[in-house]
Design a protein with these regions (language model features):
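Surface-exposed, charged secondary-structure patches
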Residues: 53-98
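Residue-level marker of positions within ordered structural domains that often coincide
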Residues: 37, 89, 124
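Acidic-enriched, low-complexity/disordered segments with a strong bias for Aspartate over Glutamate
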Residues: 1, 26, 53, 61, ...
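Short beta-strand edge/turn micro-motifs at domain boundaries
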Residues: 81, 99-179
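Core segments of small alpha/beta cavity-forming domains
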Residues: 1-62, 141, 155-160, 176
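Generic alpha-helix detector with strongest preference for long hydrophobic helices that associate
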Residues: 1, 13-14, 65, 94, ...
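Sparse, context-dependent recognition of short Cys/His-centered cofactor- or disulfide-binding micro-motifs
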Residues: 17, 53-58, 67-71, 102-104, ...
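Short, charged low-complexity intrinsically disordered segments located at boundaries
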Residues: 23-25, 45-52, 71-80, 145-150
Length: 179
């Protein structure tokens, strides 16, 4: 892939990670839809809905990505996989939606985390210049202005945009304390 740039990809992955944390806190998971695989989006949607149902808000703020690096690239059949490590520091705590009382965590304490992010795309897809500035304003299949639906489909042509068919999507995210 001659246009692939590790530097641009890591900048893209940082942006996705920060958007993910903001969408989680704001409970606006549809904002992360273009960047996650169908399976991961469903998993995260269910987890977020549990917080909403129990009237709790998981606040993740003051996110600072300290370091990123690529771990591995593999191609298996019709899928390419990129794994990377992201080290970040943030505030992470849970409050009661109504009273704003802190239920878990400490809003005054930094949490140092190490994440493994797994991105996938269809084998053979080539990086297009500027994809580090991924936009959801146009469908990569038909070019129509679009808002991606919760099913990940273009509302005009019906193409599933979030499968990695056209570009990298986050398919897994694992984190643990550390730095």
């Amino acid at each position: 892939d001659p246009m692939f740039s590790a530097e641009n990809f890591m900048a893209f992955s940082k942006e996705v990670f920060i958007k993910l944390q903001a969408a989680w806190t704001d409970r606006k998971w549809e904002e992360i839809r273009p960047f996650e695989s169908n399976e991961l989006f469903e998993q995260h949607s269910k987890q977020l809905q549990q917080y909403i149902d129990t009237k709790r808000i998981n606040i993740v703020d003051r996110v600072s990505v300290r370091k990123t690096y690529l771990n591995s690239f593999t191609q298996d059949g019709d899928k390419e996989t990129l794994k990377m490590t992201l080290k970040a520091v943030m505030k992470d705590y849970i409050i009661n939606e109504e009273t704003k009382e802190v239920l878990e965590g400490n809003p005054n304490q930094d949490m140092y985390m190490v994440y493994t992010l797994t991105f996938i795309r269809k084998a053979g897809v080539k990086t297009v210049e500027g994809t580090d500035k991924k936009s959801t304003t146009n469908c990569p299949n038909c070019g129509a202005p679009t808002n991606i639906t919760s099913s990940g489909k273009c509302e005009y042509c019906g193409s599933v945009i979030t499968t990695g068919e056209y570009d990298w999507v986050l398919s897994n995210l694992e984190g643990h304390p550390g730095m």
